[in-house]
C-alpha cells in the first residue's frame, strides 16, 4: 500500500545474493510485511494480495495486514476471508490487522473465522497506552505490534523519560523500546539513520523496574501522532 513493495523486495533479494550477506541468510530468515490499503470486496482484496506478492518478487509475504477497519463490517469480513484464502494458497504465511479497535476485533472473532488474526498493529507508547486494545489482544493471543513506539521523537525530553534514561544509562529511544518489550509488544522503531537503528535495538542489557514501568504508564495522554481509526463504524 506504500507503493514500495517492488523496491523493498528487490533490496531483500539483492542483499541475500550479495557478499554483504556474511551470515548466509536465506529468504526464510527474512520477515517481510505488507498491507491491504483499503477494505472493499473479497475479489478486490484477493487480487490486491496476489499483486503484492508478485510485486515484491519474494515468492510469498510473511505477514499481511488489513491496514484499517475502514469500509464497514461487510468489507472488513470479506477482506479477511481473502487473507484466509491467500494463506491457504501459500501466498502469505500469517494474517493480521492494523488499527483495529476492540469492537472490530470482537466482530472478526464473532464471525468464526477459519484463521484467527495473529497480529494487530496499532500506535502504542507511554503517551498513548491503549491498554483497552492491548489487553484484549493479549487475552486472545493476538500479538500487539507497536508502531510509533518512539512517539515520533516528540517526547524525548519529557522529564520522566529524561530522568529514567539517565537512571538506566540508556537513550530515550532505548527506554521507550524497552517499555514496549516489557509489556509484551513488538515495537517497530523507525529511523533512516543506521547508527540509530542499531542503537534502538540494543536494549537487552537492562530491564525497567516495575515501579518505573508504572510511572511511564501514567504518562498516558492519548497522544495520537498520526491517525486513530480504532473507533470507526
Could you describe each region identified by the protein language model?
Residues 46-66, 85-89, 111:
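CE4/NodB-like, metal-dependent polysaccharide N-deacetylase domain
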